[in-house]
């Protein structure tokens, strides 16, 4: 683990900066965020297991956080429908990616059975809760790697952001979302930094620290960690929307 973390000393993965200052207007966060997610489709066939159709990205996110927690508490693992909805949330802004991953999965019973089995096995090994301990988080990624080949949509070696998205929904208060645009927002611009474990682990610890700052709301529906992530998205500027962000990441899935 130490070797992984030390690798980032060679570049600015170890020099992340928080662009969210004390003047950030949190009262407009939802509005600004929603304006970046216009490709969201509440009637998507990949949301078949979501009982109350969400009206936007945020509503789906909060529904999934609740659904994942409820399923893990009741039966120890998340179901296929929840998994597919998470993939859709990650990929919906890029039609090619949803066709290449979500549509193929929805039309392939063998893939569905394989994922079902993997989710049960993974759920049996994942702890119900984790703390902000980087060694424990690294263990989660190692465990998810072992199941990666069976989890369609996560098996690409470059799909680190997607694997992080799954872990985020499993542990929304501890594992932050991670991708290229988040890294750019905090000043990391190395090519393929979003595929590097050392940058990931540095960012996780950075997000833990920064999300505890007093200016971030603590009593909203989303966790402070998620609110920090949303603020990074909108702070990236008007020209880099959430959809563009996901589009950049979605290119990972074209070779599945």
Describe the residue ranges of each PLM region:
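C-terminal accessory module of base-excision DNA glycosylases/AP lyases that mediates lesion recognition
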Residues: 1-80, 176-256
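Small-residue-rich anion-binding loops in enzyme active sites
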Residues: 60-107
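A generic alpha-helix structural signal
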Residues: 65, 87, 138-141, 204
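Generic structural signal for hydrophobic core residues of well-folded globular domains
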Residues: 86-93, 105, 147, 167-171, ...
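Catalytic DNA-binding helix-loop module of base-excision-repair DNA glycosylases/AP lyases
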Residues: 142-187
């Amino acid at each position: 683990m130490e070797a992984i973390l030390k690798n980032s000393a060679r570049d600015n993965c170890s020099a992340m900066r928080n662009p969210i200052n004390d003047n950030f207007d949190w009262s407009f966060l939802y509005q600004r965020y929603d304006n970046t997610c216009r490709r969201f489709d509440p009637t998507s066939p990949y949301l078949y297991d979501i009982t109350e159709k969400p009206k936007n990205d945020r509503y789906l996110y909060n529904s999934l956080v609740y659904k994942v927690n409820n399923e893990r508490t009741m039966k120890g693992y998340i179901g296929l429908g929840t998994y597919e909805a998470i993939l859709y949330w990650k990929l919906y802004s890029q039609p090619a990616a949803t066709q290449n991953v979500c549509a193929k999965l929805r039309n392939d019973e063998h893939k569905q059975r394989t994922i079902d089995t993997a989710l049960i096995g993974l759920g049996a090994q994942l702890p119900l809760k984790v703390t902000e301990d980087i060694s424990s988080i690294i263990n989660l990624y190692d465990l998810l790697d072992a199941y990666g080949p069976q989890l369609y949509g996560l098996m690409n070696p470059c799909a680190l952001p997607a694997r992080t998205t799954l872990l985020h929904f499993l542990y929304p208060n501890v594992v932050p979302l991670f991708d290229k645009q988040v890294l750019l927002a905090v000043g990391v611009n190395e090519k393929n930094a979003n595929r590097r474990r050392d940058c990931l682990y540095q960012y996780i610890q950075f997000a833990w620290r920064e999300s505890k700052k007093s200016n971030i709301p603590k009593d909203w529906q989303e966790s402070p960690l998620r609110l920090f992530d949303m603020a990074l998205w909108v702070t990236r500027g008007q020209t880099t929307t959430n959809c563009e962000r996901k589009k950049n990441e979605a290119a990972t899935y074209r070779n599945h």
